[in-house]
UniProtKB/Swiss-Prot annotation:
This is Fermitin family homolog 2. GO terms for cellular component: cell cortex; cell surface; focal adhesion; I band; intercalated disc; lamellipodium membrane; nucleus; stress fiber. The lineage of its organism: Eukaryota, Metazoa, Chordata, Craniata, Vertebrata. Gene3D superfamilies: Phosphatidylinositol 3-kinase Catalytic Subunit, Chain A, domain 1, Pleckstrin-homology domain (PH domain)/Phosphotyrosine-binding domain (PTB). It comes from Danio rerio (Zebrafish). Belongs to the kindlin family. The gene is fermt2.
Length: 684
């Protein structure tokens, strides 16, 4: 027997070679190669392809090490360097595989995605396919399982699928994502800013993508919910704990799909993960605006975010208006390609949604003095075992401080109460029909938060004081350029909720309004309990009343207003996770927003303590005990253990928001992918 044929106990042959077992997924075939540890990965693949002797383009294939869950992408590395021995089993498989993506509009699309790219890069490629700017705001989420549905097949069968396949996304496009107009101010408008339809042929922005063979503009068009049964069947979180469980499903942006056990043809949800929408511009972002609108719409209908009855009717009226205009737009656009949009552009210039909620005013104003507010305001300090209500004070709002005096005449003396609003939580409590305009303040103190309520008499007073409170919570004064726009946005939000029916202009109730599809099940049930026999007519009448306030809006303006109103809700932008705080005895919630961390009561959702990112020095993770520690400039450190969720998800949210806060319109047009990994991965 030849020496090279003698096999040793460790599986190696006497000549130093050994058998490497591989499975070729495309052919469903097992192959063994005699190799040494000194052969590099590229050489292994070359030998394998030669042995297979199958004429095929193998350029997209790579080796995957099942046991270690690792792609062997460094083709110049040897087997020894990777630590691969005779007991290893490798897969020779395509890097690009099909995924079924559920978009924010709940439609499903088949897209080929690179399973070897990090998720952050894969999402960038997906967004490039769909012409969605600022892909850093989105990510992939595993579908939450409805505990009421035990059979997965039954759940999958209920999904409405839109079978449009995206283009083949090729690897090797570079580590820095760049697309025309990521931050550019000199882009050519791609969409009509009145209705969001493409100004150029679809092939110009989807290229030779199979999407252009179908109907790509469907991504920019809102499709109405056709049956209330769809709402009934969909999973609705019943509590804050349910919402926290949904957030366990976010994928790790620093690892590939394959490393996270994502299978070919699996359903993943593409969602706006970070609620910080940068440079939202209807001229270039019709698809982005529509998908944002859809995510907001479904969040409200599935009760993922709380709103009042008046707000629900306002959202329903906007939906009804958008549904009507979407149908009209698709019918009329071919005959109206040239439109006068100057007035729409002017109106929309005030609607651009940025991190701070506004943009610089054209007027400089008086830069030598900081505006102040002074008025009679009712103040209430809730305490246990007290029945005392609101007490009226003469209040002055200077810089970021509210001072309360017993009367206007005493305003030059010592205030009875004084509140510094930096870092406070500001929550609206408004009922238009009841003329209730309250502002709830949770003001940080050494041992938690002090609760103070302000009651205003009019919408104008409320808008001015609420805008000032929101700015002060961020450490900004009324001299900030965004103050006046914030006041106008609040007044606009209130105006849309007015119910002043004029019989002359209210539309007759028609059968196509489908009110059951425009309001959440909770409010539908509430109306059923009130007047069981007339639910449909009652809700339709309320929606048509509210519709008067939005009936003159263009399609894209209505969507932008919907997004803006969604942003105005108290719970907007808070991502919840179950956590146990150091020194605490029970599970609580940690809420993460674009600018702060919130310790919350798991039962009620009330804020217990708030920490601003602007005051944060650094944060660290102890991966063994799943503890996140955050250090601040002038207050004690925060430490909590993540419960039921990988602390990497929480760590990534904090780092992700820090990363997004560094964006600026005047920076270059590329996205610093490596900086994102440094802030979010935890081990780069």
């Amino acid at each position: 027997m030849a020496l090279d044929g003698i096999r040793m106990p460790d599986g190696c042959y006497a000549d130093g070679t050994w058998e490497l077992k591989m499975h070729v997924t495309d052919l469903n075939r097992d192959v063994s190669l005699r190799v040494t540890g000194e052969i590099h990965i590229g050489g292994v693949m070359l030998k394998l392809v030669e042995k297979l002797d199958v004429k095929k383009d193998w350029s997209d294939h790579a080796l995957w090490w099942e046991k270690k869950k690792t792609w062997l992408l460094k083709t110049h590395w040897t087997l020894d360097k990777y630590g691969i021995q005779a007991d290893a089993r490798l897969l020779f498989t395509p890097q690009h595989k099909l995924l079924r993506l559920q978009l924010p509009n709940m439609k499903h699309m088949r897209v080929k995605v690179n399973f070897s790219d990090r998720v952050f890069k894969a999402v960038s490629d997906i967004c490039k396919t769909f012409n969605i700017r600022h892909p850093e705001e989105l990510s992939l989420l595993r579908k939450p399982r409805d505990p009421k549905k035990k059979k997965k097949k039954l759940e999958d069968a209920e999904e409405e699928t839109l079978e449009l396949e995206g283009p083949l996304l090729t690897p090797g496009s570079g580590s820095i994502y760049s697309s025309p107009g990521l931050y550019s101010k000199t882009m050519t408008p791609t969409y009509d800013s009145r209705d969001g339809s493409p100004l150029s042929p679809t092939s110009a922005w989807f290229g030779d993508s199979p999407l252009s063979e179908g109907n790509p503009s469907i991504l920019a068009v809102s499709q109405p919910i056709t049956s209330p049964d769809i709402l009934v069947k969909m999973y609705k979180p019943q509590s804050l704990l349910d919402k926290a469980k949904i957030n366990q499903g976010w994928l790790d942006s620093s690892r590939s799909l394959m490393e996270q056990d994502v299978k070919e043809n699996e359903v993943l949800l593409l969602r706006f993960k970070y609620h910080s929408f940068f440079d939202l511009n209807p001229k270039y972002d019709a698809i982005r605006v529509n998908q944002l609108y859809e995510q907001a719409k479904w969040a409200i209908l599935l009760e993922e975010i709380e709103c009042t009855e008046e707000e629900m009717m306002m959202f329903a009226a906007l939906q009804y208006h958008i549904n009507k205009l979407s149908i009209m737009s698709s019918d009329n656009h071919m005959n109206n390609s040239e439109k006068e949009v100057d007035e729409v552009d002017a109106a929309l210039s005030d609607l651009e949604i940025t991190l701070e909620g506004g943009k610089t005013s054209n007027t400089l104003g008086d830069i030598t003095s900081i505006p102040e507010l002074a008025d009679y305001v009712k103040v209430f300090k809730p305490k246990k075992l007290t029945l005392k209500g609101y007490k009226q004070y003469w209040c002055t709002f200077k810089d970021i401080t509210i001072s309360c005096y017993k009367s206007r005449e005493e305003a030059h003396g010592t205030p009875a109460h004084q509140m510094n609003l930096r870092g406070c939580e500001v929550t609206p409590d408004v009922n238009i029909s009841g003329q209730k305009f309250n502002i709830k303040l949770l003001i940080p103190v050494a041992d938690g938060m002090n609760e103070i309520w302000l009651r205003c008499d009019t919408e104008k007073q409320y808008a001015q004081w609420m805008a000032a409170c929101r700015l002060a919570s961020k450490g900004k004064t009324m001299a900030d350029s965004s103050y006046n726009l914030e006041v106008q946005n609040i007044l606009s939000f209130l105006k849309m909720q007015h119910m002043n029916p004029d019989p002359q202009i209210i539309e007759p109730i028609t059968t196509d309004i489908n009110p059951e599809c425009l309001v959440s099940p909770r409010y539908l049930k509430k109306y059923k309990n009130k007047q069981p026999g007339f639910v449909r007519d009652l809700i339709s009448a309320r929606i048509l009343e509210a519709h008067q306030n939005v009936a003159q809006m263009s399609l894209i303006e209505a969507k932008m207003r919907f997004i803006q109103a969604w942003q105005s809700l108290p719970e907007f932008g808070i991502t919840h996770f179950l956590a146990k705080f150091q020194g605490g005895k029970k599970d609580e919630l940690i809420g993460i927003t674009y600018n702060r961390l919130i310790r919350m009561d798991a039962g009620t959702g009330d804020a217990i303590k708030t920490w601003r990112f602007s005051n944060m020095k650094q944060w660290n993770v102890n991966w063994e005990i799943k503890m996140v520690t955050v250090e601040f400039a002038d207050e004690p450190s925060l430490a909590f253990i993540c419960a039921e969720v990988d602390c990497k998800v929480v760590h990534e949210f904090i780092g992700g928001y820090i990363f997004l806060s560094t964006r600026a319109k005047d920076q270059n047009e590329s996205l610093d992918e490596e900086m994102f990994y440094k802030l979010t991965s935890g081990w780069v």
